[in-house]
Design a protein with these regions (language model features):
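Short strand-coil-strand connectors
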Residues: 99-101
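Membrane-proximal interfacial segments on either side of biological membranes
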Residues: 1-73, 77-80, 84-92, 103-243
Length: 243
């Protein structure tokens, strides 16, 4: 649907709204995310400003170069994205809720074009998250040692409630926490029914030299863990209250 008020040749006089379904955009070579099967409604009432209300089911987001597992599948994505494409483009995310087999994540915040990869300020909560899947949502820049350890050590668990925050210039990510005013990266949550291998090791399992994590070789597995996972900046802390 489209309408205009005044001179039809003046794009600023136009307003429109439209529904879209199954929108797919491949990831770009410069690392821009891609999407598949996104649905919702887009509208505008002011020049250079757009509002997208998401109502998506069974969609995929692609984050090449950001996560080890760049393809993320979701059973639903809802919420509002507002775009102001003026001299300094800015996107505002409101009540975004993403549901997958790994849990439910909610968030709100902004991204602003401030040069380079821009500046982000987004935070939210997580519910019912599979602890063994946490490594999939830690960005590559956290470093291979940390990613390897989390993937191998955290074998099971349920994060009933958690929170997360990403704030600062993305070119400086991951912020090490020494100067919180420059940027902050945080993921933390309480874990129940956890299972963990504190000293995982790799070993060859085929003639080709392929390796996998060997569980419990150096230390007995801990089970029925109740504790807390805390990732902040480039640091990681896992605290067990009982096991």
């Amino acid at each position: 649907n489209a309408s205009f008020n005044g001179d039809y040749a003046d794009l600023g006089a136009w307003t429109f709204s439209s529904f879209f379904t199954g929108l797919s955009l491949p990831p770009a070579n410069d690392g821009m995310p891609g999407v598949r099967n996104i649905s919702g409604e887009i509208s505008t009432s002011n020049p250079g400003e757009f509002v997208v209300d998401l109502d998506t089911h069974y969609a995929t987001l692609y984050f090449p170069g950001i996560f080890r597992h760049p393809q993320m599948n979701f059973s639903s994505i809802t919420g509002r994205v507002s775009a102001a494409l003026h001299s300094t483009p800015k996107f505002t995310f409101t009540d975004i809720t993403a549901v997958s087999d790994d849990g439910t994540v909610r968030g709100s915040g902004t991204w602003e074009s401030t040069g380079g990869a821009g500046t982000i300020n987004i935070s939210g909560t997580a519910e019912g998250v599979n602890g063994a899947a946490v490594h999939k949502y830690l960005p590559i820049v956290v470093g291979d040692p940390a990613l390897d350890y989390v993937e191998a050590a955290v074998l099971a668990g349920r994060v009933s409630t958690g929170r997360w925050e990403v704030r600062g210039k993305l070119d400086d990510f991951p912020w090490n926490g020494a100067a919180p005013q420059e940027g902050h990266f945080l993921i933390e949550g309480d874990v129940t029914d956890g299972r963990m291998d504190f000293m995982p090791s790799r070993r060859a399992v085929t003639r080709s030299g392929r390796t996998q994590w060997a569980q419990g070789e150096h230390w007995p597995l801990l089970t029925n863990i109740v504790g807390r996972m805390h990732f902040e900046g480039n640091r990681m802390t896992i605290t067990g209250n009982s096991a």
